[in-house]
Amino acid sequence: MALRAMRGIVNGAAPELPVPTGGPAVGAREQALAVSRNYLSQPRLTYKTVSGVNGPLVILDHVKFPRYAEIVHLTLPDGTKRSGQVLEVSGSKAVVQVFEGTSGIDAKKTSCEFTGDILRTPVSEDMLGRVFNGSGKPIDRGPVVLAEDFLDIMGQPINPQCRIYPEEMIQTGISAIDGMNSIARGQKIPIFSAAGLPHNEIAAQICRQAGLVKKSKDVVDYSEENFAIVFAAMGVNMETARFFKSDFEENGSMDNVCLFLNLANDPTIERIITPRLALTTAEFLAYQCEKHVLVILTDMSSYAEALREVSAAREEVPGRRGFPGYMYTDLATIYERAGRVEGRNGSITQIPILTMPNDDITHPIPDLTGYITEGQIYVDRQLHNRQIYPPINVLPSLSRLMKSAIGEGMTRKDHADVSNQLYACYAIGKDVQAMKAVVGEEALTSDDLLYLEFLQKFERNFIAQGPYENRTVFETLDIGWQLLRIFPKEMLKRIPQSTLSEFYPRDSAKH
């Protein structure tokens, strides 16, 4: 019987085992089938048939059974090992994308081993407090992570029916965000920035100060025990990486942070897997360890440019500005890995940072990102030039999930009305400022002068704050009311009369 079973496995067919009818043997057939099925894969074959190298791609010929997305190990003539992934299969040809770059690859002497498996990353709770390179290898002189599991870096698709709508507001301590663009736990909201603006400082401040405004209680929860940060850097300079690392160390949160660093001098192609490694780690921490994970991805512009480089090397038809036509889909595979899942306490909140080339919000990268994500935080150069920190322009900023994360029982019942009125007054103030530049201050009405006064005080008192100033959402709303008292009650048309009568009087700040 044993010999027949062995012959069955060798001949490529699972052995015929008797179906167990009960007792401890239940599942023996399934187990035997699973074991034999795993070892029925093709043997690992090594090839020395590199027919060409093009940019980050290696083209192999005479390959037996190549599979899409299969991992390939390359051994260079000097013994250096690199890894890649099959991007394209055509008959016996295979196009392999090499993560560490193709410099030094000798077409005649490089051997390529096909593993028959997809790209998996080892994950463990011990990854917190560690620093990895863009390929997931430790670079902090610590030991290799003892994996609790090996997960596919593309992630597991979440059943839309099992997603929970984000309803718990995260208090960031930044008035422009908490008061007017509130972030919910499980949301994906990017920071639209540009070269030279303090987007890193804003992201670090959010990491330092983020806490939960508890539902049904006006109490801020600063409990840190189940909070984790996963930080992925793509194509950033050493200064940015050091800034984040030292900031996490200084505020004592490094033990709850996992860093993936692909620096500017690292291979471009590696940037394509760095965010996926980070998100796979975040999914493990959120859904297996039930932690609330904040994922920061910087800089998504570098990621998109790496995507364009691979696309150009494959000679695909380019889309807008040379970016591939599938960039929207590709970005969605990253951004849509945020959220909450029914039956699990953990959550993933994503804050991708992208630098808009030439400050252009119509550029394909911010344009497509804005379609996928639930709003954006817009960092403005004009505010930055006037020494206002954080230079967040609230007019183009947006949080699509704000409406469900604020209000009575979550923040305060006047939150939505105050936010709407501040938006309206600031927008009118901007119009008046533009008109003043044309007609002069003498031609303005008394109402116009009130809007101008509001504009200046709003930018100086509400938007501007210190990098270590942590305002509660209630302090933010009280500052908002102080500014709205510049106007007589009759001009505050966005706020219901009942809310006005409760909060407009001077002593209402005690609420």
Curated annotation (Swiss-Prot):
GO terms for cellular component: apical plasma membrane; clathrin-coated vesicle membrane; cytosol; extracellular exosome; extrinsic component of synaptic vesicle membrane; intracellular membrane-bounded organelle; lysosomal membrane; melanosome. Keywords: ATP-binding, Cell membrane, Cytoplasm, Cytoplasmic vesicle, Deafness, Disease variant, Hydrogen ion transport, Ion transport, Membrane, Nucleotide-binding, Synapse, Transport. ATP binds at R400. It is a peripheral membrane protein. The keyword Nucleotide-binding applies. Non-catalytic subunit of the V1 complex of vacuolar(H+)-ATPase (V-ATPase), a multisubunit enzyme composed of a peripheral complex (V1) that hydrolyzes ATP and a membrane integral complex (V0) that translocates protons. V-ATPase is responsible for acidifying and maintaining the pH of intracellular compartments and in some cell types, is targeted to the plasma membrane, where it is responsible for acidifying the extracellular environment. This is V-type proton ATPase subunit B, brain isoform. It comes from Homo sapiens.
